[in-house]
Amino acid sequence: MAGNSIGQHFRVTTFGESHGIALGCIVDGCPPGLEISEADLQTDLDRRRPGTSRYTTQRREPDEVKILSGVFEGKTTGTSIGLLIENTDQRSKDYSDIKDKFRPGHADYTYHQKYGIRDYRGGGRSSARETAMRVAAGAIAKKYLKQAFGVEIRAYLSQMGDVAIDKVDWNEIENNPFFCPDVDKVEAFDQLIRDLKKEGDSIGAKIQVVATNVPVGLGEPVFDRLDADIAHALMSINAVKGVEIGDGFDVVSQKGSQHRDTLSPQGFGSNHAGGILGGISTGQDIVANIALKPTSSITVPGDTINVDGESTQLITKGRHDPCVGIRAVPIAEAMLAIVVMDHLLRHRGQNHGVSTQTPKI
């Protein structure tokens, strides 16, 4: 079955291609009565939107979202919410040279072999353009989580290439085009992007995404563990090649006495587990990191083949991000929000009346 949907109780289904007429999604399962407007969704969409700075692709899409259904007099009705964003700045001629060639490092070859046909314009369905609808749907989840439960989901760029942050100031993130929480690293990020543009190359990145005030108890062992679904959602983002929950791969060198998060009446002594134990939220911050590969859409020539299997070379034309990690920050927030929202509704449906004598720490 086609993999265009995510979630069970809060379910998001997206459609559309990079150079198609429009992008869209259907959001099922949102509780009724949530005050929501196009302006609420637009805030996050503008953070992801292309062409907003010299550090990202210069494709200029307004990404103005339209709410087609599921909202009446400013409130959700409990029915399917239909969202639509029109594509307005396609330059399909930029891709005429790759009609019969496969861009190395992209999904061209695999889509062609799987479906026997591919939309070569900007990558079609495999383009990160599709994530605009995830961000729109995620904005609904973020607002509900914040209003109903005080859950807040935020992310930041923690590393680009060899440049890594040394500190986190949440108030600094929206003050620069890199979503960087360390003001002392902004200039280094700026210089790195400038150098990459001169070279016609790209670079990878790392993003940390955090959910605070998540209730204890979310997650459905054993196959729908909360961390498993988070990893699934984050890995579904274009260019993501690695996901860590909590300390992630650092646990390899840790001892049990160091890694375990001790408990006391005052709370947990640490959060190496990233807010999840046994696939269930602990009530601590949920912390995840994602690693994004450098985009293969670069002007450095690369070896490839054409549809006939013949050797050739390719220089990618078009408008592309030197570092896709920059605009992936709001996408990571959206995907974590969608998963937490889904699990919160699932937990409420099955375990609403559950209580224990043990105090929540």
From Swiss-Prot:
Thylakoid among keywords: no
Domain of life: Bacteria
Residues holding FMN: R125, S126, S127, N238, A239, G278, K293, P294, T295, S296, S297, R319
This protein's name: Chorismate synthase
Subunit structure: Homotetramer.
Cofactors named for this entry: FMNH2
Cofactor note: Reduced FMN (FMNH(2)).
Biological role: This reaction introduces a second double bond into the aromatic ring system.
Known pathway: Metabolic intermediate biosynthesis; chorismate biosynthesis; chorismate from D-erythrose 4-phosphate and phosphoenolpyruvate: step 7/7
Family according to the record: Belongs to the chorismate synthase family.
Name of the gene this protein is made from: aroC
Organism ancestry: Bacteria, Pseudomonadati, Pseudomonadota, Gammaproteobacteria, Vibrionales
